[in-house]
Amino acid sequence: MAGGAGEKPTLIRWEERDGQKVAIRHDGRLPEQLRPIRMEVGVLSNADGSALVEYGGTRVIAAVYGPREAHPRHVALPDRAIIRCRYHMAPFSTAERKTPAPTRREVELSKVIREALEAVVISELYPRTAIDVYMEVLQSDGGTRTAAITAASLALADAGIAMRDLVAGVAVGKVDGVLVLDIDEIEDNYAEADMPVAMAPSLDKVLLLQLNGVLTHDEFVKALELARKGIQVIYNLQKEALRKKYVEVSVEEGA
């Protein structure tokens, strides 16, 4: 990748392919390509549900505890469960070590992720209880909030929590005038705009959408469609990860 100290790196280059100019990203991906994605559920033995999700160099682990008795008791609701979320970036997750104390950004993201999950968890099945969701970013290379909500949704499913749908997320960015899917950290740093999106695909509902920067109306529509297509791929990977775990478990039980 071109660019010396203090210079903006070359993030988009143009190549001739089959007589057409094609945008190539700094890591070799096409604009509509996701990074390599890995998912695994049931990774923590002491949690009721857990999941590890990797989007390229971004790694997030999520753990779910509950439904369990709400403490303190006065926070319990008579008709449904309360959902508590904690999004946290490990001090070693970034190049510059961060303080262990929650930052304003982490508190805000914990809130928006909780609101997205509340839309799919059938909490009325668990009155007077609490469901605690912890998301820890182990390594940050862009798209941490969308990887976190994807991992949290998988961990809830792994815990057997009833849900209307899974939630999957991805971030779209505008880099050097080109809309690109699943931006990494360097693209995020230099993007003219970035738009994290999370959806419940089978319900066709957008549960999280944030826009940093400026997009025209046409660009916004195209970015949302790009996110939708990427989320469908991620959603299929979520279902595959759950099937893999429970098929393996049933085979072991029948052995």
Swiss-Prot record:
This is Exosome complex component Rrp41. The keyword Nuclease applies. One of its GO terms (cellular component) is cytoplasmic exosome (RNase complex). Catalytic component of the exosome, which is a complex involved in RNA degradation. Has 3'->5' exoribonuclease activity. Can also synthesize heteromeric RNA-tails. GO terms for biological process: gene expression; rRNA catabolic process. InterPro entries: ExoRNase_PH_dom1, ExoRNase_PH_dom2, ExoRNase_PH_dom2_sf, PNPase/RNase_PH_dom_sf, Ribosomal_Su5_D2-typ_SF, RNase_PH, Rrp41. The keyword Cytoplasm applies. Its EC number is 3.1.13.-. It holds the Pfam family RNase_PH. Its main location: cytoplasm. It comes from the Archaea. Belongs to the RNase PH family. Rrp41 subfamily. Keywords: Cytoplasm, Exonuclease, Exosome, Hydrolase, Nuclease.
